Amino acid sequence: MADIYAENGASAISVLTDEKFFMGNLETLRELCFTRRSNLPLLRKDFIIHEAQLYESRASGADAILLIAAALLDDEHLADLHALAIELGLTPLVEVHNAVETERALQLKDIHLIGINNRDLTTFDVSLRTTEQLRPMIPPEITIVAESGIYTAGDVERLARVSVDAILVGEALITAPDIALKVRELSGLNVETL
């Protein structure tokens, strides 16, 4: 699957490693690290809440990790994990869902990458308006990744209009009858596919 993504325009590969909620596993990340044909960066997508998970991510071949602000309620803990990730050579993607979390992310030292998740964690409703509303809060020098609810080229165009730099797509690719075609559709515009 990773090779299909790489051959059709993806700029990175997101690997679900959370077992409890998403039926992923760390072994998939390890295997991809050693078997993929491309050199695309690998993002470990998990609920990272402990320093040991960062060391584990690095040892397993991850280039980047997801830090979900909603799962890390203590600002100091979020800052410590963010700093350690950078120290270990991992790129932290700090995921936000609302204005409060966005403000928390902006307080981090050396913040370069923020993911705006369009899924409401309380209702699980998805709306691209989340990205449209939060994007203006974030300085242009910070790379913005829109996450969730991205299914069509029209969605990508809509996000490009608010200066989103990249998109993280999962469900639309996994459920597509032709994954290669869907990757090309979503990556053929002014926004990179992650």
Predicted regions and their residues:
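Glycine-rich phosphate-binding active-site loops on the catalytic face of alpha/beta enzymes
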Residues: 11, 15, 59-73, 115-123, ...
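Catalytic cores of alpha/beta
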Residues: 49-61, 99-109, 146, 150-169, ...
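C-terminal helical cap(s) of enzyme catalytic domains, especially alpha/beta-barrels
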Residues: 128, 133-137, 160, 173-194
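Glycine-rich active-site/cofactor-binding loop and its immediate structural neighborhood
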Residues: 1-45, 50-51, 56
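Charged helix-capping and loop-helix junction motifs
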Residues: 26-30, 76-80, 126-133
